[in-house]
A protein has these predicted regions:
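Zinc-dependent deaminase catalytic domain
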Residues: 1-160
Length: 160
């Protein structure tokens, strides 16, 4: 039997974490690792102690800000980073596995926190219908290693 490599294990976990999201629009999961050890996990949704979108706004999702983004939700990357920092875990030099490429604001946080590598499953640009993955472009421009996960993986009972 062949053992799975850590990239496969961590991306599979990110995919499963995405299923925990209460967001009506998109489910995203993230795993933050350092030297093959998990240091934090996250998925998109409102901060703990606030309302879940699928419960509070089941027909249309949470309220939107002036740019059309959810006004309540934290992104999966933000949740993973915030939880690590809240628990005094250093994230500098870590690797982030995420099911959706980071948006530009998340990319700025990733870079600022010293995360050295990002592996993502789906393109944010394709999801949003925009020209490029601005977050990925930003990270690459400033020296963060970024790669798209290329192996087949099961997401919502389908191989992608």
């Amino acid at each position: 039997m062949t053992k799975p490599d850590f990239d496969d294990i961590f991306m599979e976990l990110a995919v499963n974490l995405a299923k925990r999201s209460h967001c009506i629009k998109k489910h995203v999961g993230a795993v933050l690792t350092k030297e093959t050890r998990i240091i934090s996990i996250g998925y998109n949704g409102p901060p703990a102690g606030t309302h879940n979108c699928d419960v509070e706004f089941p027909e249309h999702g949470c309220a939107r800000d002036s740019k059309g983004s959810c006004s309540l939700a934290l992104h999966a990357e933000q949740n993973a980073i915030l939880y690590a920092v809240k628990n005094n875990t250093a994230v500098e030099g870590s690797t982030l596995y995420v099911t959706l490429a980071p948006c530009l604001p998340c990319a700025r946080i990733i870079f600022s926190m010293g995360i050295s590598k990002v592996i993502y499953l789906f393109s944010y640009a394709e999801y949003k219908g925009i020209g490029s993955d601005e977050g990925v472009d930003f990270l690459k421009k400033f020296g963060v290693e970024v790669e798209r996960y290329q192996k087949e993986i099961e997401v919502n009972d389908k191989l992608v």
